[in-house]
């Protein structure tokens, strides 16, 4: 795959960033800027039930944007081809920083600040560490690069689920393989 088209605009694919429950994310170029093109897929997922994935992406983006979660700007959406164009956030994932023992304390502080606005809005996000990038340009800003969110459930909040994967522990390593599969290329999202 060399190019993807979104609403008539062509994007040169540079590389696969990652595969998640809902789609493949590609680093791409439109001749002016580097962006992310996400192609929705319909592959089965044992642990998650989907409705209309494209509508869920758009609805979740709107919900998180209103709550004020730092995330990549949605640039374009091609509903018929099930593709999104998102701002590219250059930097390391929390997953990469945990493995390198370079995760700054301010990342934990920032995800907790996200929780302070998410929980009162009855919302959880996917706290898996591949979904968070510390921006290279401004190393003090953490972004949630997925748009997925769900109604709040205590068992799936950061403290009870996500935090287990934000440290180098057997739980994190088991979780990485249990959720993503051993052959996964963990980059920007799992």
Positions of predicted regions on the chain:
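Active-site beta-strand termini and strand-to-loop segments that position acidic
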Residues: 27-31, 87-88, 135
